[in-house]
Amino acid sequence: MFSIIIPIYNSENYLRYSIESVLNQSIGFKENIELILIDDGSVDSSPQICESFKNLYPNNIKIMKIENSGPSAARNCGLSNVSERSKFIGFLDSDDAFSQNALQSVYDFFCDSEHVNIAVLPVYYTGEKEGGHKLNNRFEKGTRVINILNDYKAIHFYIGGTFYRRHTLTSTVLFDESIKFWEDAIFFNQLLLKEKRYGAVAEGKYFYRKRKEQDSLVDRSWFNKKRYTYLLNECYMTLLMDSFNKYDIVLPYLQFLIVYHIKLFLYPNYRDVYKSVLDQQEQRVFVDDFIKVLKFIDPQFIKEQDMPMYYKEFMFHLLKENTEALENIKKERVLHSSCTVTSAKIKGLRLELTGHFINQYYEMKENDRIYIKYFKRLKKCKRKELKKTIEVWGYKLRDFRYAGFVVEIPIWAFAFDFVLKTPNDSLELNHVNIFKSLLTRVFKKR
């Protein structure tokens, strides 16, 4: 009934865990599951682990061996070895796992939704990180069919935990082995552009292992030239053109997906790496192509993203868009922002507080001031200049030089409010009980 494909490369530490999650499926392994293990040139004990499981279940497990060719080639090898009797195909990575009810949940969904050919599971982290993936909000309404023409925010771009009716993955539907980045997102979303809908199966779970060495590999990928202009053109532009050719527009779903992913280029750990990887001419081409991709995006889908405001401002800046729409959001959000107390020192009968008002929505100006309000008194804080800015690709997005403050208040005024005063406005910010905060820290340490 199910064929589960696992590409394997040097996965000895977690491979048993992954395979056993398939063996333990409540739907019944011997009766309903074919497991296809593709050894992609492993040099550890992964091949021996595969053989040990095949000896236990010779009728259910296939082992294929290829030279080290990458996950796309391994998955394609798996697809070409799916049995004729299989009705559904699923993908699992060699250090991840399925919940025990995963395949039964997917099977029930496909039985109930005969017109839907793709299904996905919610992702939960295991290992170095725990909790649910940010995109799991799609599953909050329970198991359902998502039509991407209507629900453009329900984006998906990873391959583990995805399932397909066998007839959907014909001999022409393969992973592009020439693409070295984001190949799983290309595969899934090119197919989704044709299908238009997929099932969000809320009952099952896909456990994605978060590892330190994995993070290290991700970090190293930013030092590969193909992570830049190549990714923009061969991945983002490929999807944009596919949508344009099929629908005569770039679907909002794809616009939202690409902005969600392209923001990675702006993250503090990555945004300046390109300068050490690309020469000056390549840097200019990269930035030009970055802007070229953004020009396919309606500013609405930038504005709606859950990301820091200054990333949105930077994208608007590159597009030469009016930021008035963002300014309205910033005015609303600054009311919910807080001053931070970084130190509190007792000086006789007085309390010296040092802190700052740094947030993504507001940059304090020279004539702005922070005040402390205790009882009916309003006390002006002294300014403490900070050397903190946020710059992306040479463009200064925030300068927090005026955001610091220092103030002395009577020791008995342990509860107070922060107030931001500008030439045109006065905004009450957060309430602070300094003794309560100190007690909380003490109990946390215990």
From Swiss-Prot:
Gene Ontology molecular function terms on file: glycosyltransferase activity; hexosyltransferase activity
Gene behind the chain: ggaA
Keyword Transferase part of the UniProt annotation: yes
Similarity comment: family membership: Belongs to the glycosyltransferase 2 family.
Top-level taxon in the UniProt lineage: Bacteria
Biological or metabolic pathway of the protein: Cell wall biogenesis; poly(glucopyranosyl N-acetylgalactosamine 1-phosphate) teichoic acid biosynthesis
Lineage of origin: Bacteria, Bacillati, Bacillota, Bacilli, Bacillales
Keyword RNA-binding: no
Known role: Involved in the biosynthesis of galactosamine-containing minor teichoic acid, a non-essential cell wall polymer in B.subtilis 168.
Protein name from the UniProt record: Minor teichoic acid biosynthesis protein GgaA
One Gene Ontology term from the biological process aspect of the record: cell wall organization
Short name of one Pfam family: Glycos_transf_2
Entry-linked CDD domains: Glyco_tranf_GTA_type (cd00761)
Originating organism: Bacillus subtilis (strain 168)
Keywords: Cell wall biogenesis/degradation, Glycosyltransferase, Teichoic acid biosynthesis, Transferase
